[in-house]
Amino acid sequence: MKVAVLGAAGGIGQALSLLLKTQLPAGSELSLYDVAPVVPGVAVDLSHIPTDVKVAGFGRDDLNGALTGADIVLIPAGMPRKPGMDRADLFNVNAGIIKVLAEGIVASCPKALVGVITNPVNGTVPIVAEVFKKAGTYDAARLFGVTTLDVIRSEAFVAELKGLDVATVKVPVIGGHSGTTILPLLSQVEGATFSDEEVAALTPRIQNAGTEVVEAKAGGGSATLSMGAAAARFCMSLVKGLQGEDVVDYAYVEGNGADAQFFAQPVRLGVNGVSEILPYGELSAFEQKAKEDMLATLKKDIQEGVDFMAS
């Protein structure tokens, strides 16, 4: 099993790489790529951790070396959010970065499972899809926007609010990966009920949790550690799927288009990526209205990615 992390020297990339070094199956390879000159040092640092996962670092000019033979590619590369910015402000900077990296994947490992972490995910995932389409190698089952951070935040906040064991809390989160497009389905949380007031307070807290971190770090970073943990968790779901285990997780994928071309929803994972897109169940009246209200924003975000490639 070879996993490549593109943008491995950044805050998310280093946290993610550390977790993968300790969690990937024995005998795996972890390939770290970044344009920052520190990346070989990150690889050396991680290589001192005694697990049976081989680590190699690749600099700016060796994207092909990092990607060749990769089964899974995770992309946290790009500029992080700063105070006063929302995810959409990042689009103009990160769209170009994602395009270049996607072209590298097409050239070096077109059959890999690709997990896009670079924000704004609503728009960067369509860019990757368009790059693959242009090359004639697009397979929707192999492309994922990683929205796991919304899920783990929801789990943490619900457990805290209700005094539950967080290990038992499961919160479905559908839609997109920014602002109101993030839709936690609190009505479906087993073992907990929420008042209308709690739903009205908790939903925006989950949606704006990224801003909470950016402001708390006072210009010193964004949600790097929790995002690293979320990406590692999603990567391990992909690994289990590749190993033939029956795994269901949430991700932003191209489905049947019932809601939007790309939509975060439950998916069954297998040896070829998505083996089945699952229904997300019945919504409460609050959730139904929230979904209807955000679809125009989500579709606009998706179109922005498509238009970027068309230009």
Curated annotation (Swiss-Prot):
The lineage of its organism: Bacteria, Pseudomonadati, Pseudomonadota, Gammaproteobacteria, Alteromonadales. It comes from Colwellia psychrerythraea (strain 34H / ATCC BAA-681) (Vibrio psychroerythus). This is Malate dehydrogenase. One of its GO terms (biological process) is tricarboxylic acid cycle. GO terms for cellular component: cytoplasm. HAMAP family: Malate_dehydrog_1. Catalyzes the reversible oxidation of malate to oxaloacetate. Substrate binds at residues 81, 87, 119, 153. GO terms for molecular function: L-malate dehydrogenase (NAD+) activity. The keyword Ribonucleoprotein does not apply. Its EC number is 1.1.1.37. Pfam families: Ldh_1_C, Ldh_1_N. The keyword Oxidoreductase applies. Keywords: NAD, Oxidoreductase, Tricarboxylic acid cycle. NAD(+) binds at residues 7-13, 34, 94, 117-119, 227. Signal peptide: none annotated. The active site is at 177 (proton acceptor). Homodimer. The gene is mdh. Belongs to the LDH/MDH superfamily. MDH type 1 family. InterPro entries: L-lactate/malate_DH (IPR001557), Lactate/malate_DH_C (IPR022383), Lactate/malate_DH_N (IPR001236), Lactate_DH/Glyco_Ohase_4_C (IPR015955), Malate_DH_AS (IPR001252), Malate_DH_type1 (IPR010097), Malate_DH_type1_bac (IPR023958), NAD(P)-bd_dom_sf (IPR036291). It comes from the Bacteria. It catalyses: (S)-malate + NAD(+) = oxaloacetate + NADH + H(+).
